Structure formats: C-alpha cells, structure tokens
Amino acid sequence: MAYDLLLERFLRYAKINTRSDENATRTPTTQSQVDFALNILKPELEELGLSNIHYLESNGYLVATLPANDDRLTRKIGFISHMDTADFNAEGVSPQVIESYDGGIIPLGTSGYNLDPADFPNLQNYIGQTLITTDGTTLLGADDKSGIAEIMTALAHLKANPEIKHCEIRVGFGPDEEIGIGADKFDVDDFDVDFAYTVDGGPLGELQYETFSAAGAELIFHGRNVHPGTAKGQMVNALQLAIDFHNQLPAEDRPELTDGYQGFNHLQTMTGTVEEANSSYIIRDFETESFENRKATFQEIADKMNQAYGQTRVDLVIKDQYYNMRQVIEKDMMPVELAKEVMEDLGIVPVIEPIRGGTDGSKISFKGIPTPNIFAGGENMHGRYEFVSLQTMEKAVDVILGIISKP
C-alpha cells in the first residue's frame, strides 16, 4: 500500500546527521541523537496521540505506547529502530529520488561515483520502483532511518484509520546500535512487552532470528629494539610477532572467504613499531562450541608464543560482545511464525536467514524480550552506495500493521 508522507518522512530523517561515536563515553555517544529524539521524534509521537512518551536519559531510548483498541487483541508488541548511522560521512546528506528506475547506471550526484548494476546486481531487483540513493558524498542512513520512518508511518496510518483494530504497541527508538552498545542499558521492565521486533533488516522479506555470537580480541606484542646492524640474536620485532600470531590462525577463516553459517576471525587493525605492536580482531560464529573454540585458539597461540620466548611477549584480552539470539527465540518461535504468516498473507516471500552480524535485538532477547528482526529495505548499507526502495518501505509498513492486527 502507498502511504502519504512515508517518503517525505524518510527524507527528512535522513538529512539529519545522527552518526554515533565509538570513542565517546557518554550515552548516547553524540548529542545529535539526543536532539533527534527530543526535537524531531518526540513531538511527532505526541502529534500522533501516543501515550506514556518518555526519553530515558539512562539509556538514550525514546519510548511511547499506543494502547490497544480491541480487548480481544491481548498481546503487547514492541517495534524498535536505532537512530544512529554508521561510521561514514553523515554531514550534508542530500538524497536523490529516482522514480521508475530503468535498470541503468545511476550517477550519484556530481561526485563521480555511480550505482552500476555491473557492480551491484541487486539493482536489477528494483526496476520500475522508486529508489532513494545518496549523492555520492555521504551515506544515506536507511540503516536505520527507514525503520524509524516505517514505524512512524504505521502509527500515522492507525491514527488516520481508527477502525483498524490492533493490540497494544510499544515503540522504542534507541542510540548507538552501529557501534554495538545501543542495547547495553535497554530497560526491559520499562518497555514491558511480550515480544518485539527490530525493524532494521535489509531487502524485502528478510526475517531473522539468528545472529553471530561475537567477541573482540585485543593483543599487545612486546618487542626489543636494538640497532638493526647488530640485531642478530638480540632484536625482537613486535611487528613480526603480530604477523607470526596472525599466520597461525586458520587462513580460510576470514570474512572475505566465508558466508552462510560459517564463522570467521577478522583482523581489523594492526599498528606498531619494533618495540610494541597492537592487533585488534573480531571473532564471530553461530554455534556456541565453535565460538568457544575460536577464542581458545587465540589463547593457545598466545601461550605457545610466550612459552617459546620464555617470557610474556604477547598480551591477549578477549571480551564477549553479544550472543546468538537463536538461543532465546527458538524456545518460543511464535514471534517469528507470526511475522512469517503476515508476510505470506501479503504475498511477500519470507527470507529466513542468519544475520552475519548483530542487532540490538540480540542483547534485548537475552535481557528477556524475544526480538527477531524484520526488513526495513536498505541495501549496500554503511556507505555512499547505500539505497532503499520506497516500495519495499511501504511493504515494511504493511507488515507492521499486519503483525499488530493479527488475532
């Protein structure tokens, strides 16, 4: 269904810079997210007639309730999207609207960059549709401004059509998802629903209840610097230690060589000098045993290297980040089955695949609210090639409305 103001709402949100900052220690990490919540979203929720609208300074979430209008619909269902955007330029976002896309190359403004089907064959799925792209100088922010716009549009549709019967709805717009800390302080008692959905997925039909289990590994390599001309038997090159460590990890377990249910070890940064070097990894797997084995491999390599040198040359710290929410959701698949049934009723083919990443829903699920993820429409997210289909966004609104009105 076409919805008035969905496009306008998304464009307005997308133009606001709400980039998060992984180096900040406050919550939210940027003031722009607070301003977006209080100055843009909160007044809109008030205008739409929601109740119990409140901003939680403790965690940066803006929360509101739409009471049920049918006593027979007793569920309490939440919808959650994040306000921040990824680590890419978000200042001066100037979206392009391409109506009736013809399948060709889309110039991204005057930037010299193009959306080319030869590079992005997923464009062929959108011929004839209205696409919103960047101008090539910023990201778009469909992750997750599209989700916010879809939730708001569903609420506006309910206000304009009070005859539509629905259960109690709770909405939550949160911070800092892109840097992995947005749901750390999520208040499940305040949100108070039976289950929820993050509206934070990608293409049409995505329905996800499995994420990676995730950890981060930080390594410090301690070298000994002497003049290279007299280094034999004396120098210990910390950079070489970092290389040696990396080369002992399974060569095939890298992101660029894995897909589906395969996990990986990803070297994100390696910096240093002969005297000291640092490496930072992320560790990902879907299965608990494999996840634990990966972490154990890191420790075994560090221990072996320290033993070989007879002293501590490698310091390793591993911290778990989040866990596969399947462990929670598979105990009661009703939220997944409900969304699947609604999609099928709407003629949408559910695409049930694992998320090769994480969502706020993972941490929220482990806090006590099962929270699978549904599509929001974005493609090529986190950069200048990001785009979203208006028609996919409309169908996401259809799914939200179907979920809250399903007996």
UniProtKB/Swiss-Prot annotation:
Zn(2+) 2 binds at residues 143, 178, 382. GO terms for cellular component: cytosol. Keywords: Aminopeptidase, Cytoplasm, Hydrolase, Metal-binding, Metalloprotease, Protease, Zinc. It catalyses: Release of the N-terminal residue from a tripeptide. Cleaves the N-terminal amino acid of tripeptides. It is found in: Cytoplasm. One of its GO terms (biological process) is proteolysis. Its EC number is 3.4.11.4. This is Peptidase T. The lineage of its organism: Bacteria, Bacillati, Bacillota, Bacilli, Lactobacillales. GO terms for molecular function: metallopeptidase activity; tripeptide aminopeptidase activity; zinc ion binding. Belongs to the peptidase M20B family. The active site is at residues 84, 177. Binds 2 Zn(2+) ions per subunit. Gene3D superfamilies: 3.30.70.360, Zn peptidases (3.40.630.10). Zn(2+) 1 binds at residues 82, 143, 200. Its cofactor is Zn(2+).
